[in-house]
Amino acid sequence: MKLYPTIGLEIHAELLTSSKVFCTCSAEFGGEPNSRCCPVCSGLPGTLPVLNAKAVEYIIKAGYIMNCEISRFTKWDRKNYFYPDLPKAYQISQMPRPVCLGGHVDVTVDGEQKTMRINRIHLEEDAGKLVHDDIERVSLADYNRCGIPLIEIVTEPDFHSAAEVIAFFEKIRLMLQYAGVCDGKLEQGSMRCDVNISLAEKDSDKLGTRTEVKNLNSTKAIQRAIEYEIYRQTELIENGERVVQETLHFNDATGETSSLRSKEDAHDYRYFPDPDIPPIIFTEEELAAIKADIPEMPEQRVARYTGEYGISAADAKVLTDSKRVSDLFENAVKAYNNPKPIGTFIVVELMRRINLGELDLDNMKFTAEDLAKLIELAETGKISKDNRKIILREMLETGKKPETIAEEQQLWIKEDNALLEKTINGIMEANPKAVEQYRSGETKVFGFLMGQCNKALKGAASPASIKAMLEEKLKG
């Protein structure tokens, strides 16, 4: 019997608001435990929530970039359950009237484009965080995260492999970063993914019993959890055992899932309207203004880079696969309007250093303007392209301006014609065979002779000057 996995996702993304969704406490990550709480987010009796308008704006932007229909009327509900990280014993969420309905996002997996449907996106408050101390045998509650605005993106069960899930998750993350809605910092828990998995025969109209793996916050964890759960369910079914509908925890250390609790359905949470938060009716003018404020998305930047700047599609994709890289490129082009060499340098030189861990864009010692100046110095013939790498290395280490480094290390190109002629004569005398080959029509050796001259001159003359004089000398 061939079993076929069907997967649906619930992606939770924290919004980039400065304050929490129903109070004025800071929504910034970190802080001393329980230092960013107030009576509202701590769930004390007699407090009233006040809705953060910026959070509503951000969920509408998220809906638009995912091709959702924005509800003209929306309201909030109480999702009732008890857990130590939820001081009110209910979570303010949305059930029958979410802000966003429907929608889809296209992803490419193994060269094939697939459309993944979205069921809904709703706005809710995050819960707190439990810290378990195995030595003292206690669990500590940190409520700093309580009340941070969160959107939950609920997909249709359109996924059938870990590769499809990861492609979708990464694209959603990138889109939210570009829209300025979520920072996508997985290591800080800004985005988390719950994965619902069931197995059934490929042509069956009926899905199997589903399990939910909770709170996966890295693509590696998502992949391993899906692969293990498919394996576990396959073993159960093939051995004639029953798959239990339950919520699971994924253990990073063992690579296995374990049961947390039975899997709840919506009616188990006893949703009812929150009486303290009035519904919202959006006007067409309000929605149009929010939509007009959405920044350029990655696909739009790729089209502009290839169409206006003449950058290759492959390089344009590299430049836009990270918002930080793309913003660096954008700001450098503003400082020096020569996009193609800037883009090539970022793709070839900076990306290599980023991948090697030599450059962290969040803690860069030089600015986009410094990068632009470095490219300009090389493109205008003031430094050689070899010396450009030397200057970049120093910029990475010290943050000094490229002009300062060029001056300190005497890396400027000095057009000394006497030195240039003497060097070329010496290279030709040292390589008589190559000279003869060139004069006999084997012009390929010109590159070799140019390389020898560049190496000997060490940036003391521009490539154009070297080329012109070398060609003249070789004519005999």
Regions found by a protein language model. Name each.
Residues 443-476:
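Short, amphipathic C-terminal "tail helix"
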Residues 62, 229, 332, 345, ...:
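Amphipathic alpha-helical segments in well-ordered regions
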Residues 189-201, 306-330, 339-356, 369-371, ...:
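Core structural elements
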Residues 335-336, 342, 350-365, 373-378, ...:
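M16/insulysin-pitrilysin zinc metalloprotease superfamily fold
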Residues 361-372, 376, 385-455:
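Strongly charged, low-complexity linkers/loops
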Residues 286-293, 300, 330-335, 371-383:
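Extended, non-catalytic structural segments that build the interaction scaffolds
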Residues 1, 310, 333-342, 382-383, ...:
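Structural motif
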Residues 1-296, 313, 334-338, 348:
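Basic, nucleic-acid-interacting segments
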